[in-house]
Amino acid sequence: MVGGFMKRRNFIFGALAGLGALVDGAGLLVRQEKFGRAPSGERLARIQASRHYVNGQFVCLEPVEMMTEDLPDEEKPNRIETIYRVLFGGDDGRVPKEAIPSSKTDLHAIPREQNVAIWMGHSTFYLQIGGRRILVDPVFSDYGSPIFFINRAFRGSNVYTAADIPELDVLLITHDHWDHLDYATVMALKPKVKEIVCPLGVGEFFEQWGFDLAHLHEEDWDTDIALADDFHIHILSSQHFSGRFLTRNNTEWCGFAIVTPRRRVYISGDGGYGKHFADIGRRFDGFDLAMMENGQYNMQWHAIHMLPNETAQAAEDVRARILLPAHSGKFALALHTWQEPYRELLKESAGRPYRMVTPRIGETVDVENPADFPNWWEGMA
């Protein structure tokens, strides 16, 4: 009897010790610099003064639920099961069996006066507009998460490194999620970045990481940042959320408009479909190029990640001349097959008043007169 008691006691103590070690390990993990810290002081005061900050968190222009309940009861999947399948589930065609094809352009060799866009996988883009070099949401790491075994990049999708990037006039960050704000990448780019533009709260990361605040432009939605008389960046609303761990929505998320005397470029950032797209299209009288989210969607969260038919409509709403899809081709963050976003958006774009281009990673899109690109994903497993 005493022996049984001792075994139970040892089991309980062992379990508590294991739990304590797990908690301590998690505590050490989240204290790493890459997790960032909550906004405070003057930055927090600016955040609290925003009309988009309500009851201690940022909110979208229209009330939305992150996980919607649009499906009939008998078709509603279990949320925990869905998230588990996304993070740890089997292949199911979500990850390509072959390497993603690429064509690595030498960025240093592109004349500055040439207006181009280069997709680098997922939502990372290199742009040259109005003689400026711009990098959007750079993620050159092998994982789009803080944990090495979650959200691994597709084979072949990481062809660029910070060493390949020329000196940048502007670094644009749409929000703080790991697949858009990557600590290792931005730290490697640090010596090359002249100006940073980001939404409210995201500047806290750059301050903690030692960037020069004199070159940080951290503003609310509907702010026009004039980096020069002939070069403006507008921070615009999107329908999404933020957070790098348990705390949600203490930093803002956004899209961008880049405006020069000759060209206008739109970057949607992550987000669901809403009337803000038509408002943006009217406000800027259309765009020469729109880089729009298309991928990692699901009916359970389509309020914060557009479905392909919604992306097609959004591109029409913003009056895009050229549509360049984003948020696919590198990470599996949903249950659809990796090719589906391209196939569905191509189908939904038929007959629309814009031209959809589908370059491989690293191929140059000439904003003035884009080439025809093949459907490179077809025939791949």
State each model region's role.
Residues 127, 137, 175, 233, ...:
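Divalent metal-coordination and catalytic microenvironments
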Residues 2-5, 10-151, 158-161, 164, 199-267, 344-363, ...:
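Metallo-beta-lactamase
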Residues 122-128, 226-287, 302, 306-310:
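Catalytic core of the metallo-beta-lactamase
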Residues 138-140, 176, 238-239, 269-271, ...:
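Active-site metal-binding loops of divalent metal-dependent hydrolases
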